[in-house]
């Protein structure tokens, strides 16, 4: 359905025309082929291909209305596609559901629901327990361990309605961790959190990567993409480009994704977060931010 152009953005996927016979190809965690999603006959995603190797951190980046959240929901089967195929480790998502964890946007959750932090995190184990089984001591221990990783142990008995935005996000991440998934989808995990929570989330993502897990996150802050992620997918209804940040996150590709609505920052103007590695060449260069 697509016609590749030799002058177009470089992409890394199983549909590329480039020869890879002599290159060891990493195992694909996610493979999306010709995915199209429409709302009331209006295309939100159009003919999207995406291949994600296992064991890396991938940012999905694009302007508002680009279809970023829709892409995640379509992969997870939460939105029916008009066309296309999704494979998780080479098999349909329905057969691999237990390998996947999901952290939706905080705004999509009823935080006034009367439940404690510990109970909310243990809900992440329901899929593994099976129908009709209640969580026991093992599930409680797993939940407490996950809460310790996000530094929320002191809040186990607190009602979720009493948490701050950053605390809510940490609890949501803990709920995903107890699923012990191989792939985690996160929809704007850094949105509305304080600097301490953002730092903690970055550390958690890096820990998941060190365990061989794959993380796909919708992300809006273009400045931090090179510091936080290994790969990036630029999306604007269609996939603009996808691959290693150092090769894909270029001025040209950003202009294609944002329609020229990007102000570019020079290296001197780029402020590096405290947890970044100044020796990493992937964090150097020009990066963009969206103009209001």
How should these model regions be labeled?
Residues 184-188:
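Catalytic Walker B motif of ABC-type/P-loop ATPase nucleotide-binding domains
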Residues 61-63:
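The feature captures the beta-strand-to-loop junction immediately N-terminal to the Walker
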Residues 84-96:
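Conserved ABC transporter NBD signature motif
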Residues 159-163, 167:
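Conserved ABC ATPase signature
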Residues 219-220:
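H-loop/switch region of ABC-family ATPase nucleotide-binding domains
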Residues 122, 137-155:
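Conserved ABC ATPase "signature" region
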Residues 231-245:
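H-loop (His-switch) and adjacent beta-strand-loop-beta switch element
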């Amino acid at each position: 359905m697509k016609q590749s152009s030799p002058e177009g953005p470089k992409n890394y996927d199983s549909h590329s025309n480039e020869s890879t016979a002599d290159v060891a190809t990493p195992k694909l965690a996610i493979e999306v082929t010709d995915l199209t999603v429409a709302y009331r006959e209006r295309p939100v995603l159009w003919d999207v291909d995406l291949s994600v190797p296992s064991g890396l951190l991938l940012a999905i980046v694009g302007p508002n209305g680009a279809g970023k959240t829709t892409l995640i929901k379509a992969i997870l089967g939460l939105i029916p596609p008009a066309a296309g195929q999704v494979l998780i480790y080479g098999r349909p998502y329905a057969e691999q559901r237990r390998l996947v964890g999901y952290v939706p946007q905080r705004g999509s959750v009823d935080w006034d629901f009367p439940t404690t932090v510990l109970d909310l995190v243990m809900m992440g184990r329901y899929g593994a327990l099976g129908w009709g089984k209640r969580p026991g001591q093992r599930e409680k221990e797993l939940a407490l361990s996950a809460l310790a990783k996000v530094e929320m142990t002191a809040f186990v008995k607190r009602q979720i309605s009493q948490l701050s935005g950053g605390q809510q996000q940490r609890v949501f991440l803990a709920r995903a961790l107890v699923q012990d998934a191989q792939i985690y989808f996160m929809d704007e995990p850094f949105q509305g959190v304080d600097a301490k929570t953002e730092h903690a989330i970055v550390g958690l993502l890096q820990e998941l990567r060190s365990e061989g897990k794959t993380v796909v996150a919708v992300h809006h802050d273009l400045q931090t993409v090179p510091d936080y992620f290994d790969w990036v997918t630029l999306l604007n209804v269609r996939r603009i480009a996808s691959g290693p940040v150092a090769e894909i996150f270029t001025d040209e590709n950003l202009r294609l994704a944002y329609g020229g609505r990007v102000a570019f920052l020079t290296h001197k103007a780029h402020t590096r977060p405290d947890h970044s590695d100044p020796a990493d060449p992937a964090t150097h260069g020009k990066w963009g931010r969206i103009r209001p």
